[in-house]
Amino acid sequence: MARLAGVDIPNEKRIEIALTYIFGVGRTRAKETLAATGISPDIRVKDLTDEQLITLRDYLEANYKIEGDLRREIDADIRRKIQINCYQGQRHRKGLPVRGQRTKTNARTRKGPKRTVAGKKKATK
């Protein structure tokens, strides 16, 4: 397995798909990278030369934030929003959806499993 940006890239896949294993690189960015470096998107990772791997690594590191740097930046943005107490920060703090989604129903992924709340007791006569 080849390593790019600290990630093991699968040997049997086409390089266009294999690059998407790197956090911060999707299909579009993979295509742009391959076009800029002049590498065919149809070539398999196992068929890449060391020179091509070095070219890819250098291009990705020079032009994009990927893996650890990107994760740190995202975490810092969330921490900043929480600290300045903006609406999105409040939603992050409470563990609720941040971008205006409804919460009366759905939002179970963000809110976690249902917690049953006791209803009103029947009044005895």
From Swiss-Prot:
<dbReference type="GO" id="GO:0000049">
    <property type="term" value="F:tRNA binding"/>
</dbReference>
<dbReference type="InterPro" id="IPR018269">
    <property type="entry name" value="Ribosomal_uS13_CS"/>
</dbReference>
<dbReference type="InterPro" id="IPR019980">
    <property type="entry name" value="Ribosomal_uS13_bac-type"/>
</dbReference>
<keyword id="KW-0699">rRNA-binding</keyword>
<keyword id="KW-0820">tRNA-binding</keyword>
<keyword id="KW-0687">Ribonucleoprotein</keyword>
<keyword id="KW-0694">RNA-binding</keyword>
<dbReference type="InterPro" id="IPR001892">
    <property type="entry name" value="Ribosomal_uS13"/>
</dbReference>
<keyword id="KW-0689">Ribosomal protein</keyword>
<dbReference type="Pfam" id="PF00416">
    <property type="entry name" value="Ribosomal_S13"/>
</dbReference>
<dbReference type="GO" id="GO:0006412">
    <property type="term" value="P:translation"/>
</dbReference>
<dbReference type="InterPro" id="IPR027437">
    <property type="entry name" value="Rbsml_uS13_C"/>
</dbReference>
<dbReference type="GO" id="GO:0015935">
    <property type="term" value="C:small ribosomal subunit"/>
</dbReference>
<dbReference type="GO" id="GO:0003735">
    <property type="term" value="F:structural constituent of ribosome"/>
</dbReference>
<dbReference type="GO" id="GO:0019843">
    <property type="term" value="F:rRNA binding"/>
</dbReference>
<comment type="similarity">
    <text>Belongs to the universal ribosomal protein uS13 family.</text>
</comment>
<feature type="region of interest" description="Disordered">
    <location>
        <begin position="90"/>
        <end position="125"/>
    </location>
</feature>
<comment type="function">
    <text>Located at the top of the head of the 30S subunit, it contacts several helices of the 16S rRNA. In the 70S ribosome it contacts the 23S rRNA (bridge B1a) and protein L5 of the 50S subunit (bridge B1b), connecting the 2 subunits; these bridges are implicated in subunit movement. Contacts the tRNAs in the A and P-sites.</text>
</comment>
<dbReference type="InterPro" id="IPR010979">
    <property type="entry name" value="Ribosomal_uS13-like_H2TH"/>
</dbReference>
<protein>
    <recommendedName>
        <fullName>Small ribosomal subunit protein uS13</fullName>
    </recommendedName>
</protein>
<dbReference type="GO" id="GO:0005829">
    <property type="term" value="C:cytosol"/>
</dbReference>
<comment type="subunit">
    <text>Part of the 30S ribosomal subunit. Forms a loose heterodimer with protein S19. Forms two bridges to the 50S subunit in the 70S ribosome.</text>
</comment>
